[in-house]
Amino acid sequence: MKKNLRRFVGGTLLLIATACGKNNTDPDPTPDPEPGVDPTPEIVVRDLSANGTSNCYIILQTGACSFDATVKGNGAATEGLDAPEKMSPDSAALVWETSKGMITDVKLKDGTISFKAGDVNGNALIAAYSADKRVIWSWHIWFPEENVKTVTAKSGYEVMNMNLGAMTSTFGSAPDVKPYGLLYQWGRKDPFPSAPSLTGNEKTQPVPVYGPDGAEVKITYSLWSSVENNTIEYSIANPTKCLSNYAQYNTSRDWLKASDSNDALWGNPKGGERNSDNNYVNKGSKSFYDPCPVGYRVPPADVFRTFTTTGGYTQDPSSFDVVDLNGDGVIDTRDYNYGWSFNMKEGSLFFPAAARYDGSYAMLMGSKSGLWGSYWGNSPAKSYGATTGFGFCVLAFMNGAAGTSVSATASAGRADAYSVRCVKE
């Protein structure tokens, strides 16, 4: 503020302009703005289903996420399966997570499930519920420690660099269970946690999982005495229950009761058929029960046929198309490291021996951890005599006291829970 001071000098009136500021200092010509409230920062919600829906969504960073909860899987009609009707869930909640705090603030609004991803990696299962609190669908949320990418196999397929649900594609400075991933009964979309240790025994329990309250959620199993409840509807409503085939083992190895058995669940009911050149001709397509994330699917029967020189089963390590890990110029069991590194078109990919759930007892076989590796394909396998309910294994290997073998075309009971290595659609 300027003031005019009057002073008489030699009888003359002088007007002197002076400036006044705080503490007699020169003022800032621009006045300080009035204090205000900072605007609320906009919360960016990542729509995980923006490029398509699936039963599994990958997240690679923390923050708010959402996905369409009205569509079952990819919502597609495939051979043997009609397109599913859309859902109208009443609520949503976390079922389990492998790392506490990985998923919080699960909400449902206008057919969209939203949640916040914490700063811990892991796997989780989120479910949508009906008004009577029954699970009507569930989704696997996968937060790996490294980026998911593909490598071209010698068969031409673009193969995911890690198991479905794995944290890493290879071991770090020392072997650990991070590459093991999750395990699936053939045809089911919901995963089960694998072994918590590289090796185990009959008493080994799966990796612990936790509910929204932090309490441990138990992975249970169905009755051994009956398969009457073993239906698709029951499996969807009970995503934490491994379904046993014990009561029908001699006639069907399916987790579904034999009368409900369905070859089309993973989108390739005729995938086991071969032509006159002995090649698999039906590749199938992704079904709405497929457990793989957007853009990926469970692989067809011929994906890993180059993993052995025979294209099938062999006990001769020199016939395994694997990396010579110790560099001695010989392929043998010394190149095995809780799994095999199979050669691809360029480079290699590691396939760990992530154990399995036995389909009869519907429990983890921890004694096979680090010794047996089995990987599902999307097609059924042929019956053995009068026994039905087999699924196609695109890769099965073992290494232990019982011997060493690799098979690129195997089969097993659908009630067994095995690894899945997805391929690009």
What are these regions (language model features)?
Residues M1-L5, C20, W186, T251, ...:
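Intrinsically disordered, low-complexity sequence elements enriched in Ser/Thr/Gly/Pro
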Residues V148, A166, S252-E425:
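C-terminal, surface-exposed recognition/capping segments
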Residues G11-L14, F192:
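N-terminal processing/targeting junctions
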Residues M1-L5, L15-V44, C422:
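Bacterial Sec-dependent N-terminal signal peptides
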Residues D38-K286, G312, A381, R414-D416, ...:
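Short, compositionally biased
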